[in-house]
């Protein structure tokens, strides 16, 4: 489970080789530590971040800020994702 970065109390991470067939690039966001019900954000090939679900119930204000950070770092995230395949 590579942690990509931390934003305050939240970690942004992905699971290595998650699901079969392998899902497209996405990250999970959780407070404190990785959990199985973390918020999920898809990352498009253009670097746009799209909310899949907010299972960890992060407030809209914080989540919107985090999505902007994810988009700003989308190249790094995609590189890390591809290096873990």
Stretches with model-predicted labels:
Residues 1-15:
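Negatively charged, low-complexity tracts enriched in Asp/Glu with abundant Ser/Thr
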Residues 19-60:
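A short, structured beta-strand/loop element
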Residues 54-85:
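Acidic, low-complexity intrinsically disordered segments
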Residues 11, 24-26, 70:
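Proteins with a high burden of low-complexity, intrinsically disordered sequence enriched in S/T/G/P/A and R
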